[in-house]
Amino acid sequence: MEIAGAQTGIQAYGDAESEALTEEIALNDFLEANDIEPVETDLGEYILQISGQPPSHIIGPAVHMTKDEISDLFERHHGGPRLEEASDLVAAARKILRQQYLAADVGITGANFLVAETGSAITVTNEGNAELTQGLPRTHIVIASLEKVVPTMEDAFTLLRLLARSATGQEFTSYTTVMTGPKRAVDLDGPAHFHVVLLDNGRSQMLGNEFREMLRCIRCGACMNHCPVYVATGGHAYGWVYPGPMGSVLTPQLIGIENGFPLPNASTFCGRCEQVCPVRIPLPKLMRHWREEQFRRQLT
């Protein structure tokens, strides 16, 4: 954030995986330690931020909370009369967040895909929060992991169709935005400064081992929705950023099997996760590899 010189930061995410990246590197903690206020702008993430809870799903981060719990939370945090209707809760959050957008020095988004052909970053949302975050503050920072890079725009839009259909059952999300650099002299709006942070954080090591197929993951969350273990336990039981079958494979790679060794055992090997995966990642096979590694190291 030194390059931005920000006093107030707004964070928005192109998808929940992008939000997960900032959790992976503890970005919010770093910003707060440097007197920069981060504000989540995805509605689910905003709810979790003011409640002090971690997300439980990579697409619907607050799916574990009921409407009544959110009503209680807004009443405590915002004051005023208790709001009972979902539309009223959304309107209250919109009113508060709109002021944060206008006050922000820096907008931080993720990217669902980065296009090598054009140097573009693509975000998809159903709330429009990423679009406001990249367009209103004077500086826009994109944070994305290296497996988000695809060769061409055609490749990106093929994957975007898979992502929307597997994540929310839509043909396309409500907002799909392609960003290619800061605004030009002739542009009336857009950020004056544009930066892309490409995060490795152990992923390049996966290219040379048996878990490289995990890098195909587009973070749709379908594997979680069909996993009997995830449905029974919820996302918080997985203990770190990434829940469900994809987390059971990815987490041991990122934080070490010695820290994440229980996760590959959180599976019935029913195969549903592989069946619904739009990019056909063999998740049961990869969890079995981790179990073999756990046995080899005698981790119990």
Residue ranges and their predicted role:
Residues 151-153, 167-172, 225, 232, ...:
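Acidic/polar loop patches that form or flank catalytic/metal-binding clefts of enzymes
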Residues 217, 221-224:
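Phosphate-binding glycine-rich loops and their immediate beta-loop-alpha structural context
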